[in-house]
Amino acid sequence: LGLVGSEMCIRDRNKAIDKGAFLISTPEVTNIISLDRQKLKRSVFLEKDDPFLIEFTKIAKKKSVWILLGSIVIKDNKNKLYNRSYLINSKGNIQCKYDKIHMFDVKISKKESYKESKIFKPGKKVVVTNTPWGKIGLSICYDLRFPELYRKQVMMGAKLITIPSAFTTTTGKAHWHNLVKTRAIENGSYVLAPAQYGKNSLKRHTYGHSLIVSPWGEILAEKKAGKGIIMASLDFKELHKIRANMPSFRTQILK
């Protein structure tokens, strides 16, 4: 498994492939980061024309790897914008796609607030799909704060949870590691969390710290500073052992 930062996703993808990665993932909003709705409408593409999506489907097919395009901003025929994640299989076909459900509508401080619902149309569908190594559940960034989504995915069979993100520096320092580890532990699942890093605009700095976390909550790999890739091996026998020894999917006492 390899997680690749968006700034270098095209240039450095082969590093992860050459090291044997079977799944490569990029962070949230791989193609463009902007809070300007009109700029996005002018800059992004319809799904069938998006150059990032086209390029990554070609790479997946050529290299026979799976690629999670963490998310890209896409527009539809009605000029509506979506924050959409794509899982591309090793044949270069789109295995599934997921539209971010929970919009980042928050006030962090007097000087820092966000209103994604003014930019994107939220998704409505929980997405879990089959892969050669088991089922994967897709999510994006702010979804991380809503545990019900992940429990639903695990009950649908997910063994891996993907959370491509662009956490702000403020919220990242306070909550990122705790939230990612908690989702892994409470769901007995591997969590893949590639994260945007750096100064994106005058108003927005993203925290980075891409993570790969085990079902026991152990950080298997972390990009602690700067840009780059991280890799880890996933042991699904260990996942099944943890779930058997720590059965947290029993019928709930409280209903």
Residue ranges and their predicted role:
Residues 30-33, 102-104, 238:
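Feature marks short, surface-exposed loop/turn motifs that line or immediately flank catalytic pockets
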Residues 76-156, 169-178, 244-248:
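Active-site catalytic loop in hydrolytic enzyme cores
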Residues 48-69, 135, 141-230:
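CN hydrolase (nitrilase-like) catalytic-core segments centered on the catalytic cysteine
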Residues 1-10:
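Single conserved hydrophobic/aromatic residue that forms the stacking wall/gate
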Residues 69-71, 84-87, 127-129, 210-212, ...:
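Short beta-strand scaffold segments in enzyme catalytic cores
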Residues 237-255:
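A short C-terminal boundary segment appended to hydrolase-like catalytic domains
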